Design a protein with these regions (language model features):
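C-terminal alpha-helical "lid/dimerization" subdomain adjacent to the S-adenosyl-L-methionine
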Residues: 164-212
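Hydrophobic adenine-recognition pocket in adenosine-nucleotide-binding enzymes
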Residues: 139
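Short glycine-dipeptide loop
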Residues: 159-163
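Conserved alpha-helix/loop element of class I SAM-dependent methyltransferases that forms part
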Residues: 58-74
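N-terminal, positively charged/glycine-rich alpha-helical extensions of SAM-dependent methyltransferases
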Residues: 5-50
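Class I SAM-dependent methyltransferase SAM/SAH-binding core
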Residues: 79, 84-124
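A conserved beta-strand element that flanks and buttresses the S-adenosyl-L-methionine
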Residues: 135
Length: 216
């Protein structure tokens, strides 16, 4: 094959790959410095439960995600956007956790065999039946602005009673190291309060964690 032609093909493939990484945010390899897919996504999925356990014990002093779920009747059907390794997903047979990462879903199924999980995209997921609640825990700070709006709109279309968002406080002051592993965080911090202006905001941990609730 002509060397110039080969170089052009390599350049086109590289450009296409780089373009996808830049704009198809769930597959951005810079998220948490490891990404959520492939080999490094598998490593990320393995260490995530340990990080959650450490944070609950040493930063919050309680099980953060379960403290949100226990605010609601256990019989409620809950759709969990961006479920990760499953700690934020309700434990009953009418609730479901979805995530774009196969690695995260596989790990969630190992840890919580009695919960329901499947691959799904928070912007595009559709269901014949609505859920009582839609939760979104620690997802939106990993999402570009336009896509955050799409996720919120989709959540509203799928929920019967409430939308519950648990995430980094809008007045949080991140370290440079954290910003390096959270490519959309600064935009999130600057805009999330305006984007959720119709939600009731509850301070879970001052300057650290906020809960936003929308009653439908």
């Amino acid at each position: 094959m002509n060397k110039l032609l080969l170089k052009n093909i390599v350049f086109i493939l590289y450009f296409k790959y780089s373009f996808c990484l830049k704009y198809d945010y769930p597959y951005n390899p810079n998220i948490h410095n490891l990404g959520n897919t492939g080999f490094w996504g598998s490593i990320h999925a393995k260490i995530t439960p340990k990080f959650i356990s450490y944070s609950d014990k040493n930063l919050y002093g309680f099980n953060l995600r379960q403290s949100v779920l226990t605010r609601f009747d256990k019989s409620k059907s809950i759709l969990d956007f961006g479920c990760g390794t499953g700690f934020s997903t309700n434990c009953n047979n009418i609730s479901l956790g979805i995530d774009t990462s196969l690695q995260m879903i596989n790990e969630a199924k190992k840890i919580f065999p009695n919960k329901k999980f499947e691959i799904g995209h928070a912007e595009y997921f559709k269901s014949m039946n609505k859920y009582d609640l839609v939760t979104c825990m620690f997802l939106l700070h990993e999402v570009p602005k336009v896509n955050r709006k799409n996720i919120i709109d989709n959540a509203i279309s799928l929920a019967k009673e409430k939308i519950i968002i648990l995430d980094i406080a809008s007045n949080y002051n991140p370290s440079k190291f954290m910003i390096n592993g959270e490519p959309y965080l600064e935009d999130y911090l600057n805009n999330i309060d305006n984007e959720l202006e119709n939600f009731k905001k509850i301070i879970i941990k001052e300057n650290h964690i906020h809960l936003w609730v929308l009653e439908l």
